[in-house]
Amino acid sequence: MKLVFLFFIVAVMVSLFVGMTEADKPRFLTTVCQDTYEKCKEQMLKKDKK
């Protein structure tokens, strides 16, 4: 889970540098958040099955 959290922080940092235009920033952040959320959900489902 630490790796996912670290990836999220890096992605946010990258989004701030890369997506400087206001139109791109929310779209990029939304994609990152959804991607991170899906990964977290998968991890939680795997834990529940054990």
Curated annotation (Swiss-Prot):
Location(s) in or outside the cell: Secreted
Keyword Signal: yes
Tissues and organs where the protein is expressed, per its UniProt entry: Expressed by the venom apparatus.
Main localization, broad class: secreted
Disulfide bonds: C33-C40
GO MF term set: toxin activity
Entry's Gene Ontology cellular component terms: extracellular region
Keywords: Cleavage on pair of basic residues, Disulfide bond, Secreted, Signal, Toxin
Signal peptide: 1-23
Origin superkingdom: Eukaryota
Keyword Transcription: no
Task of the protein: Probable toxin.
Family designation: Belongs to the caterpillar 9 family.
UniProt protein name: U-megalopygitoxin(9)-Mo13
Gene source species: Megalopyge opercularis
